[in-house]
């Protein structure tokens, strides 16, 4: 079971990404803090992001140093507990 107090979450986003907004809202609604990295503002290429997350699309979510994937993957991850 994930604990909001001990779970480290990083979400790679862009400003125009609808699923990114949904993922951030979902995490906030669940009581989780997260670090957001806007790849456009931070000038991170998708290839650089993929080397850290294993994915080219946004959002890419990393929980406790483990790449989870996108928004649908996040929902599945929480469903499994």
Feature names for model-found ranges:
Residues 1-33:
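Local sequence-structure signature of Cys/Sec-based thiol-disulfide redox active-site neighborhoods
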Residues 4-5, 46-50:
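Short secondary-structure transition/capping segments
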Residues 18, 40, 75:
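Nucleotide phosphate-binding site architecture
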Residues 18, 44, 69:
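Short alpha-helical
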Residues 32, 56, 69:
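Structured loop/turn residues at beta-strand edges in well-structured enzyme cores
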Residues 33-45:
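Thiol-based oxidoreductase modules, predominantly thioredoxin-like and allied folds used
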Residues 51-57:
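Thiol/disulfide oxidoreductase modules built on the thioredoxin-like
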Residues 63-81:
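Non-catalytic, surface beta->alpha helical segment in thiol-disulfide oxidoreductase systems
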């Amino acid at each position: 079971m994930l604990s909001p107090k001990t779970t480290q979450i990083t979400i790679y986003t862009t400003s125009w990404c609808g699923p990114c907004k949904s993922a951030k809202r979902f995490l906030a609604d669940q009581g989780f803090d997260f670090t957001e990295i806007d790849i456009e503002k931070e000038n991170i290429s998708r290839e650089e992001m993929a080397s850290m997350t294993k994915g080219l699309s946004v959002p890419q979510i990393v929980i406790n140093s483990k790449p989870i994937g996108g928004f649908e993957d996040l929902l599945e991850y929480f469903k499994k507990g």
